Structure formats: C-alpha cells, structure tokens
Amino acid sequence: MTASLANYLSSLVWAAVIVVIPAAVALVLISQNDQMYRK
C-alpha cells in the first residue's frame, strides 16, 4: 500500500467517523424525544 493510498483510506475513515457518530447521536436523541412526546 502506498503512502498516498493509506492517507486516502484514513481520510475516508475519519470522514465516516465525523459524519456517522454525530448522526447516530442525533438519531438517538431524536428517538428519545419522540418517545417522550408520544407519552
């Protein structure tokens, strides 16, 4: 694996982490709020 390929893959991983984790947190918070509203 070349250095540029490794950098590309690591940037993809970090982009996924930056996008997926906040999205997952937001979904959890929204679902919890929905349950509260339904009660």
Swiss-Prot record:
**Gene3D superfamilies (alphabetical):** Single helix bin
Q: Which organism is it from?
A: Prochlorococcus marinus (strain MIT 9313)
Q: Name one GO biological process term.
A: photosynthesis
What family does this belong to?
Answer: Belongs to the PsbX family. Type 1 subfamily.
Q: What is its main location?
A: membrane
Q: What does this protein do?
A: Involved in the binding and/or turnover of quinones at the Q(B) site of photosystem II (PSII). PSII is a light-driven water plastoquinone oxidoreductase, using light energy to abstract electrons from H(2)O, generating a proton gradient subsequently used for ATP formation.
Q: Where is the signal peptide?
A: none
Membrane topology, as annotated? Single-pass membrane protein
* InterPro entries with a match to the protein in the record: PSII_PsbX (IPR009518), PSII_PsbX_type_1_subfam (IPR023431)
Domain of life of the organism in this record? Answer: Bacteria
| Assembly and oligomerization | PSII is composed of 1 copy each of membrane proteins PsbA, PsbB, PsbC, PsbD, PsbE, PsbF, PsbH, PsbI, PsbJ, PsbK, PsbL, PsbM, PsbT, PsbX, PsbY, Psb30/Ycf12, peripheral proteins PsbO, CyanoQ (PsbQ), PsbU, PsbV and a large number of cofactors. It forms dimeric complexes.
The name under which this protein is listed is Photosystem II reaction center protein X
Q: Which cellular compartments is it found in?
A: Cellular thylakoid membrane
Cellular component per GO, a single term: plasma membrane-derived thylakoid membrane
Q: Which residues cross the membrane?
A: 10-30
**What keywords would UniProt list here?**
Membrane, Photosynthesis, Photosystem II, Thylakoid, Transmembrane, Transmembrane helix
